[in-house]
C-alpha cells in the first residue's frame, strides 16, 4: 500500500520554515531543545482557549523571542496587557533568559488546518454529528478562498461498535507538488465512546518566488504595561 508522508515535513526548506529558528553549539543544543519543549507545553495549556495555530521560537543574543499565531489576540494580551506580561515572566523563569512575545493575528481561521481540526474535534466532543461538522468546515474553507480541502475523521463514529473512516474533499489537494501551499494538521476528540481522530489538509494555492502564505496577517507587539458538491468516502 502507498503511504503518505507528512505534507508539512516534506516541504521544510522549500516553502515552509521550521517552528524553532535558532542555532546552538553542541553543549547548548540539548538545553535549548528541552527549553523549547517546556515553553510549548506551557503555552499549550495556558492558551488552550485562545485558538493558537502555531508558535515560532527564536533565540537572539541570550534571549528568547516567541511569535504566537492566534485567531483571538485579545485573549492572549489580556486586559491592559496583563496576561501577556504574566506569560513573559513565566517563560523567563522556564528558560532562564529574558523573553519577548509578539502576537500575530490570523484573519481567516477557517483556512488554518490546526484551527479547523480543533474546531471539528470540539464539535464532536459536544455530540454534534460528525458529517455536519465536516461539511461545514469544508464549505467555510472553500467560501473563503481555499483551492481545495480534505477532512477525515476516524474512530467509533456516532458510537458505532466498529471503528471506521469517513472523509470529505472538495477542490484540489496536490500532495506531490512541493510548491503547493499545503496546510496539514491533526486533532483528537475525546468522546464517551473513545478517541476520534481528525485530519485536515488545506490547499491554499501555489507559492512562486517570495510569496508568503501569511500575507494578510496583522502583528501585535504588546508592550510591558456556497454550497458545492462534496465527495464522500467511507472505509471500515
Curated annotation (Swiss-Prot):
Coiled-coil residue windows: none
Classification via SUPFAM superfamilies: Prokaryotic type KH domain (KH-domain type II) (SSF54814), Ribosomal protein S3 C-terminal domain (SSF54821)
A Gene Ontology cellular-component term: cytosolic small ribosomal subunit
Function: Binds the lower part of the 30S subunit head. Binds mRNA in the 70S ribosome, positioning it for translation.
Domain of life the protein comes from: Bacteria
SMART domains from the UniProt entry: KH (SM00322)
Family: Belongs to the universal ribosomal protein uS3 family.
Membrane-spanning parts: none
InterPro entries on file: KH_dom, KH_dom-like_a/b, KH_dom_type_2, KH_sf_prok-type, Ribosomal_S3_C_sf, Ribosomal_uS3_bac-typ, Ribosomal_uS3_C, Ribosomal_uS3_CS
Keywords from the named record: Ribonucleoprotein, Ribosomal protein, RNA-binding, rRNA-binding
Name of the molecule in the record: Small ribosomal subunit protein uS3
GO biological process, one term: translation
Residue span(s) of domain KH type-2: 39-107
A GO molecular-function annotation: mRNA binding
PROSITE patterns xref list: KH_TYPE_2 (PS50823), RIBOSOMAL_S3 (PS00548)
Complex formation: Part of the 30S ribosomal subunit. Forms a tight complex with proteins S10 and S14.
Amino acid at each position: 500500500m502507498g503511504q503518505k508522508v507528512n505534507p508539512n515535513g516534506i516541504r521544510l526548506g522549500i516553502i515552509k520554515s521550521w517552528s524553532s529558528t535558532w542555532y546552538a553549539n553542541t553543549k547548548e543544543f540539548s538545553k535549548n531543545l528541552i527549553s523549547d519543549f517546556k515553553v510549548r507545553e506551557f503555552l499549550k495549556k495556558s492558551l488552550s482557549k485562545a485558538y493558537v495555530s502555531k508558535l515560532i521560537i527564536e533565540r537572539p543574543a541570550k534571549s528568547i523571542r516567541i511569535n504566537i499565531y492566534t485567531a483571538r489576540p485579545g485573549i492572549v494580551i489580556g486586559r491592559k496587557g496583563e496576561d501577556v506580561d504574566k506569560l513573559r515572566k513565566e517563560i523567563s523563569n522556564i528558560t532562564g533568559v529574558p523573553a519577548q512575545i509578539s502576537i500575530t493575528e490570523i484573519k481567516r481561521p477557517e483556512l488554518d488546518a490546526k484551527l479547523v481540526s480543533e474546531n471539528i474535534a470540539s464539535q464532536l466532543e459536544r455530540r454534534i454529528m460528525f458529517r455536519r461538522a465536516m461539511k461545514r468546515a469544508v464549505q467555510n474553507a472553500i467560501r473563503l478562498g481555499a483551492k481545495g480541502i480534505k477532512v477525515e475523521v476516524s474512530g467509533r463514529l456516532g458510537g458505532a461498535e466498529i471503528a471506521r473512516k469517513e472523509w470529505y474533499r472538495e477542490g484540489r489537494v496536490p500532495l506531490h507538488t512541493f510548491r503547493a501551499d499545503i496546510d496539514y494538521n491533526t486533532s483528537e476528540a475525546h468522546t464517551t465512546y473513545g478517541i476520534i481522530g481528525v485530519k485536515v489538509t488545506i490547499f491554499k494555492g501555489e507559492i512562486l518566488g517570495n510569496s508568503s502564505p501569511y500575507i494578510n496577517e496583522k502583528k501585535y507587539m504588546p508592550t510591558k504595561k456556497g454550497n458545492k458538491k462534496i465527495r464522500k468516502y467511507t472505509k471500515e
